[in-house]
Swiss-Prot record:
Phylogenetic placement of the source organism: Bacteria, Bacillati, Actinomycetota, Actinomycetes, Mycobacteriales
Organism (species): Corynebacterium jeikeium (strain K411)
Alphabetic keyword roster: Cytoplasm, DNA-binding
Record-given protein name: Nucleoid-associated protein jk2011
Record-stated family: Belongs to the YbaB/EbfC family.
One Pfam family matching this protein: YbaB_DNA_bd
Subunit structure comment from the entry: Homodimer.
Amino acid sequence: MSQPDMNQLMQQAQQMQAQLQEAQREIAASTVKGEAGNGLVTISVAGSGEVTDMEIDPKIVDPEDIDTLKDLLLGAFKDANQKLQTLAEEKMGPLSQGMSGLGF
């Protein structure tokens, strides 16, 4: 089996790096929205992980039942984080598979 040309490997590595940077830019420019309680609580999270917005339906705000609100907020945060992780895997997954062709 012949060894790959070093120039070809370098070119492939540079292409992969450019694709990786583009995927990272796309993720950073994205916003995902997590929700809980069928949309009673929604949380928007930027690709950087920063929470950018939160919406709480007033009908669930009950001073006598703060635990339910806390549970819904936590659920919305978890949902948003899961969606952000899925987005990153979708953008980065094909790139990591391509690295196997470079001998990594």
